């Protein structure tokens, strides 16, 4: 069944703001949410920068549900409700079986795990009763489903830094295959906890100050927390109810490097971008804006630049590219969901968000990465790259309708 899939609502929160309007506003104005991590439960870990959500918005999550939720699930539910409000949609007995959710989670509930096991290890006592269900990778999808009453296809997706794009791709498949008419899809993660930060510190991957994608002298990744969700519908379902269509999910490209657990390879990202263009029926020249994976590490940014050149040829120098991780940091499982918001808003507003914190050109990353200043241009097609550790790659193309 060849069904077009469109986006009719979006929700999100991260260090930049607690709704899509504020996320887009500050990202487009190159404001960076990166700063010292103020979490009081870092157990002596010093000098860590990240992009924290300083205060959650009012969410009205039922107390009985809240006690079984990790922060990842809370963020996902808040974003899902915002997306539903924007879409003007509700779930009821008439549509619940045709309404599902896929939520990408890159790391899982380490916040709940650490809070439960630290006292247990020191005292030998029992852990908190909901620890297991808070920490499971599918928890966010389950909690979104229960909060909204969704009874169609519901599952979690985990592929590290590409989890949200894989979740959106999976949701597209559910609609195209006829298993659902509407899907909530995106990602959520909350990695600013001691055990995760220590693990990334051990990999020597963390930047000491900020995230500078594609800039000479960049020093690594900065982690952030957040969630992004979108309401996906079949085109027929959306038009039948008179919904406002924000963009079409025009293509999906998935691949694996089969190379190394941490080191990047060019062929995997190249294959995913080519597959995405083919799936969307697009030529390379049709892409106006590419939201890069752009983590701010020397190897990854150089690798992605090479892959982009291979796929787009001369057009690689004509299209606009940026990494919004420079503003909201790397939110792991939520990263490409937040970048989906950037792509759709670029199409809606005709503005390419900048790569913030850019200092000086790197000759190995010589494409137009929209340094520091947003750019007005017509964006008919935007592409979003997500390339994860372990070599799991997921690329999406969004198109103006």
Swiss-Prot record:
Cite the active-site annotation. Answer: 161 (for beta-ketoacyl synthase activity), 293 (for beta-ketoacyl synthase activity), 330 (for beta-ketoacyl synthase activity)
Write out the GO cellular component annotations. Answer: plasma membrane
Which parts pass through the membrane? 328-347
Domain (Ketosynthase family 3 (KS3)) spans: 2-400
- Could you list this entry's UniProt keywords, alphabetically sorted: Cell inner membrane, Cell membrane, Membrane, Nodulation, Plasmid, Transferase, Transmembrane, Transmembrane helix
Which SMART domains does this one have? PKS_KS
Which class of enzymes does this protein belong to? transferase
Q: Which cysteines are joined by disulfide bonds?
A: none
A Gene Ontology biological process term? fatty acid biosynthetic process
Chief localisation class: membrane
Indicate where this protein resides in the cell. Cell inner membrane
- At the top level, the lineage of the source is Bacteria
Q: What Enzyme Commission number(s) apply to this enzyme?
A: 2.3.1.-
Instruction: Offer an example of a GO molecular function term for this protein.
Output: 3-oxoacyl-[acyl-carrier-protein] synthase activity
The family line of this record is: Belongs to the thiolase-like superfamily. Beta-ketoacyl-ACP synthases family.
The job of this chain, per UniProt, is described as: Proposed to synthesize NOD factor fatty acyl chain. Involved in the synthesis of a highly unsaturated fatty acid moiety, which forms part of a lipo-oligosaccharide that is responsible for host specificity.
What is the designated name of this protein? Nodulation protein E
What phylogenetic lineage does the species belong to?
Answer: Bacteria, Pseudomonadati, Pseudomonadota, Alphaproteobacteria, Hyphomicrobiales
């Amino acid at each position: 069944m060849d069904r077009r899939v469109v986006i009719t609502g979006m929700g999100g929160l991260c260090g930049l703001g607690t709704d899509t309007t504020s996320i887009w506003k500050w990202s487009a104005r190159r404001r960076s949410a990166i700063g010292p991590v103020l979490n009081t439960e870092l157990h002596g870990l010093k000098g860590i920068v990240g992009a924290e959500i300083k205060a959650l918005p009012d969410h009205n999550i039922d107390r009985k549900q809240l006690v079984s939720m990790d922060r990842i699930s809370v963020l996902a539910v808040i974003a899902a409700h915002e997306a539903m409000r924007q879409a003007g949609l509700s779930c009821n007995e008439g549509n619940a079986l045709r309404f599902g959710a896929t939520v990408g989670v890159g790391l899982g509930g380490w916040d709940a795990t650490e809070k439960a096991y630290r006292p247990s290890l020191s005292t030998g006592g029992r852990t908190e009763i909901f620890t297991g269900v808070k920490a499971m990778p599918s928890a966010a999808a389950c909690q979104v489903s229960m909060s909204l009453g969704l009874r169609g296809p519901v599952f979690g997706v985990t592929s590290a830094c590409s989890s949200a794009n894989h979740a959106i791709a999976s949701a597209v498949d559910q609609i195209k295959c006829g298993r659902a008419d509407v899907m909530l899809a995106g990602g959520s993660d909350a990695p600013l906890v001691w055990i995760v930060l220590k693990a990334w510190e051990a990999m020597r991957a963390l930047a000491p100050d900020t995230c500078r994608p594609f800039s000479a002298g960049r020093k690594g990744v900065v982690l952030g927390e957040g969630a992004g969700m979108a309401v996906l519908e079949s085109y027929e379902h959306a038009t039948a109810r008179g919904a406002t269509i924000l963009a079409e999910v025009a293509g999906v490209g998935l691949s694996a490097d089969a190379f190394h657990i941490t080191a990047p390879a060019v062929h995997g990202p190249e294959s995913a971008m080519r597959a995405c263009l083919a799936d969307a029926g697009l030529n390379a020249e049709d892409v106006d804006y590419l939201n890069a994976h752009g983590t701010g590490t020397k190897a990854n940014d150089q690798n992605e630049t090479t892959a982009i050149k291979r796929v787009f040829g001369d057009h690689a120098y004509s299209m606009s590219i940026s990494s919004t991780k420079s503003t909201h940091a790397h939110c792991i499982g939520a990263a490409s969901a937040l970048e989906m918001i950037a792509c759709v808003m670029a199409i809606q507003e005709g503005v390419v968000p900048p790569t913030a914190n850019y200092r000086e050109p790197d000759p190995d990353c010589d494409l137009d990465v929209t340094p520091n200043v947003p750019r007005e241009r017509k964006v008919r097609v935007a592409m979003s790259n997500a390339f994860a550790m372990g070599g799991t790659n997921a690329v999406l193309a969004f198109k103006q309708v």
